[in-house]
């Protein structure tokens, strides 16, 4: 009889574990080359995914692209407007529980791009909400770059991204602002192009994303 109860308890535990394992929250990382990764620099996902696996915290990365780190929706060289054009299709195919957006590079300061980037970012978020009204958006204030004057608009952009997150949160959307600019120094945290993260920079980005993910209810 005792042996039978042991078998029942083991079966219940296994079934419960399987249910919990099946409840992993899906995460879609959307962005440019900083999200997609490359041979000449370190991608934050390489660090983030490994750290989350160590903690067994139940996040599953999804997306149309895939590398050794994870699935994702990162596209090298794409600015926010280009990401907007593909976002509806991506979100329809991969309606994630959580969308991480790091987008704002690949524009030019001389074009005064900030207003357009904000407008396109909001439209991307609307597309994510259309695919999953319960989605949580982790919206990044993007990492600074030393490639100047091209990226001299980034400080202004990050102020406006914070305002966007605040406005959308006020109307009831699940928006979490993730400040990747704070503590990130392009002089020490990027490779020679002064834009893409080195190992130290990728670690800083991964830590910020992980803190935001683990803080979610």
Where are these regions (language model features)?
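Positively charged n-region of N-terminal signal peptides that target proteins for export
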Residues: 1-5
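Bacterial N-terminal signal peptides
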Residues: 6-16
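Sec/Tat signal peptide C-region and signal peptidase I cleavage site
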Residues: 17-21
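Loop/turn elements at helix/coil->beta-strand transitions in domains of secreted/extracellular proteins
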Residues: 23-27, 55-60, 94-100, 132-138, ...
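Conserved SGNH/GDSL esterase-like catalytic core that processes O-acyl groups on lipids
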Residues: 26-28, 34-122, 146-159
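Structured segments of extracytoplasmic/periplasmic soluble domains
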Residues: 33, 37, 50-55, 89-93, ...
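Active-site segments of SGNH/GDSL-like serine hydrolases
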Residues: 102-106, 126-157, 179-182
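Catalytic His-Asp segment of secreted/periplasmic serine-dependent ester chemistry enzymes
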Residues: 144-217
């Amino acid at each position: 009889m005792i042996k039978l109860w042991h078998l029942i308890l083991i079966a219940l535990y296994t079934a419960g574990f399987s249910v919990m394992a099946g409840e992993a929250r899906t995460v879609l990382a959307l962005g440019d080359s900083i999200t997609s990764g490359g041979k000449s620099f370190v991608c934050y996902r390489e660090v983030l995914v490994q750290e989350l696996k160590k903690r067994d915290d139940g996040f599953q990365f999804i997306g149309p692209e895939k590398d050794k780190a994870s699935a994702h929706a990162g596209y090298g060289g794409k600015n926010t407007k280009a990401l907007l054009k593909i976002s509806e299709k991506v979100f329809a195919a991969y309606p994630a529980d959580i969308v991480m957006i790091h987008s704002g590079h690949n524009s030019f300061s001389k074009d005064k791009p900030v207003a357009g980037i904000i407008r396109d970012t909001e439209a991307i978020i609307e597309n994510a909400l259309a695919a999953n009204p319960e989605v949580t958006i982790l919206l990044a204030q993007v990492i600074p770059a030393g490639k100047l004057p091209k990226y001299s608009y980034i400080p202004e952009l990050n102020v406006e991204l914070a305002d966007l997150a605040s406005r959308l949160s006020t109307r009831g959307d699940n928006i979490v602002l993730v400040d990747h600019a704070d503590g990130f120094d392009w002089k020490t945290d990027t490779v020679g192009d002064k834009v893409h993260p080195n190992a130290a920079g990728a670690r800083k980005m991964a830590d910020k994303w992980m803190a935001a993910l683990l803080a979610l209810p």
